[in-house]
Amino acid sequence: MIPMTYLFVLCPLLFAAVAWGIKNRLRPLVLLAAALIHLLSTLWVTVTPQSPADGGWLWLDPLGRIVLFCISVLFTICAFYAVGYLRYYNKRSNRFLCVCMLVCLSAMTLVSMAQHLGLFWVAMETTTLTMAPLIYFYRNARSIEATWNYIIICSVGIALAFLGLMFLSYSTHLAH
């Protein structure tokens, strides 16, 4: 049986796969359904005790529960807004927007549950990189410039975070 923590990460990815394959007008509803299921699951897991042995590298500590709750509430608000916005702005396909938002939800969930620094870093950088297509949604000169600026600035952050992770890993090996 798959632990609940893994389902939290996999569920938005499954919704992203569904959103990839369906029509434009239905994608915002998939986004909203994923948000509501994630929020209800988050509320359930917030009140249910979980021991660290249940998940290994993935489990929710008390701080992770608070972070996951905040992520889920904010994503649900964004999903409600996206339904109306994407119905109004229907000139372009919303495939990348919906799929990237769901992949980002999955990665943010993984960030709140990761108990391994390497996994935490990968999840954090996945959230960063899945935001780039969202910045480029309008597909004009200003959005491409903003996307490139975002990627360049975030690449520096990714490199510094990785360097810090290496220093932290090295220092923990020296301590043992």
What are these regions (language model features)?
Residues M1-C100:
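Transmembrane helix-loop-helix hairpins at membrane boundaries of multipass inner-membrane proteins
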Residues S72-F75, L105-T109:
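Generic beta-strand or strand-like secondary-structure segments
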Residues F96-V103, T109-H176:
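Alpha-helical multi-pass transmembrane bundles of energy-transducing inner-membrane proteins
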